[in-house]
A protein has these predicted regions:
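N-terminal/domain-start segments enriched in small and hydrophobic, helix-friendly residues
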Residues: 2-26, 80, 87, 152-156
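Carboxylate-rich helix-loop segments that flank metal/cofactor sites and access channels
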Residues: 4, 64-117
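Alpha-helical bundle segments that constitute or directly flank the non-heme di-iron/ferroxidase center
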Residues: 9-43, 103-127
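Alpha-helical scaffold segments that form or flank carboxylate-/histidine-based iron centers
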Residues: 16-24, 45-63, 102-106, 131-143
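Generic structural concept
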Residues: 18, 25, 29, 52-55, ...
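Charged/polar positions within long, soluble alpha-helices
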Residues: 33-40, 63-70, 74, 92, ...
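Conserved alpha-helical segments that form or flank metal/cofactor-binding pockets of metalloenzymes
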Residues: 47-83, 150-153
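Preference for long, well-ordered alpha-helical segments
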Residues: 105, 109-158
Length: 158
């Protein structure tokens, strides 16, 4: 395993790449758990299905990134959500919003999606190896679409 990855004359160490990917994995775990928990409490059936599917998408995104880390020789890739406060930091206190109906739950989900967008934006600012950058770019496009869907659903329920 090489100790450095060179891109555009800027060297990003494998450790920096690993840390960048771990931060995205952490936010994906939060999203996976957040979408799942909220899906259990939404009253709108189409939203329930969307949120359940989105939880699975985040699990798949996480698996794709973990596979990249394994290919780079990192074998301990199990993460448990964001270090800075877990799901409550990025998805709010879901339990506090359960009594607020779908609109309140959708606000919570949108805040979580804002955090996910920010994590991807931060990662994509870095000079990552091209295959990793392509993977994150593709995932980020999906996260943006999901954010917009959640926001539109929230706005429709004002």
């Amino acid at each position: 395993m090489a100790t450095e990855t060179t891109t555009h004359n800027h060297k990003l160490s494998n450790k920096e790449v690993e840390e960048t990917l771990r931060s995205v994995i952490q936010i994906l775990i939060d999203g996976q758990e957040g979408f799942e928990k909220i899906s259990e409490h939404l009253t709108d059936e189409s939203l329930r299905r969307y949120f359940a599917a989105e939880s699975l998408n985040r699990a798949q995104f996480r698996g794709d990134i973990e596979e990249v880390l394994h290919q780079e020789g990192v074998h301990d890739v199990k993460e448990s959500g964001t270090v800075a406060g877990g799901i409550h930091r990025t998805w709010g206190d879901i339990k506090a919003h359960l009594g607020g109906g779908d609109h309140s739950l959708l606000e919570t989900a949108e805040a979580g999606e804002d955090a996910a967008k920010k994590a991807y934006q931060e990662a994509l600012k870095k000079e990552l190896p091209l295959p990793i950058k392509q993977l994150l770019t593709s995932q980020y496009a999906h996260v943006q679409e999901s954010h917009d869907y959640v926001k539109a659903a929230r706005d429709a329920r004002k």
